[in-house]
């Protein structure tokens, strides 16, 4: 449609977290704010799903648009034991060229799966750790501490040394 869309997280990662949108015909701006902002935010403080934000739009093979975002399910102490979960809600494009997520109702309580064929994972999920290097499936976040693990300490095993810390 000739627009650049800036999809931004606002409100931190706690309660009040949400997704706002701006758009511009020029990548460098200026950007106008969506009249539907926030396009995703939990407005009900008693709802079971909170902290909805950090979203991205994706389009599936059938042309349906979705918003993939993070959220949390707090327990009685307002802690999210499972941490930041991933969620998926449908996107609706409006007549004025903007979009809303889940018709502006906030996070769905039940996730709706896209109408796509099942994708079978073809890779072998077995690793005997008999190589001198870890397979790519053992990806590290950021730079790995190579002194905290070994494939040679006990051949055929992935040896990991933990460190002291509080959980």
Description of each model-found segment:
Residues 1-167:
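Carbohydrate-active catalytic/glycan-binding domains of CAZyme proteins
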């Amino acid at each position: 449609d000739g627009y650049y869309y800036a999809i931004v997280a606002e409100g931190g990662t706690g309660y009040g977290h949400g997704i706002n949108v701006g758009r511009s015909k020029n990548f460098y701006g200026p950007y106008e704010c969506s009249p539907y902002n926030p396009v995703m935010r939990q407005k009900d403080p008693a709802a079971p799903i909170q902290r909805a934000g950090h979203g991205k739009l994706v389009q599936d093979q059938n042309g349906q648009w979705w918003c993939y975002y993070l959220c949390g399910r707090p327990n009685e102490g307002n802690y999210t034991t499972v941490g930041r979960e991933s969620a998926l809600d449908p996107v609706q494009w409006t007549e004025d060229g903007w979009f809303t997520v889940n018709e502006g109702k906030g996070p769905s309580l039940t996730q709706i799966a896209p109408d796509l064929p099942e994708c079978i994972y073809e890779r072998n999920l077995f690793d005997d750790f008999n190589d001198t290097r870890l397979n790519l499936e053992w990806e590290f976040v950021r730079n790995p501490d190579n002194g905290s693990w070994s494939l040679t300490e006990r051949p055929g095993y992935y040896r990991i040394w933990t460190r002291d810390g509080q959980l």
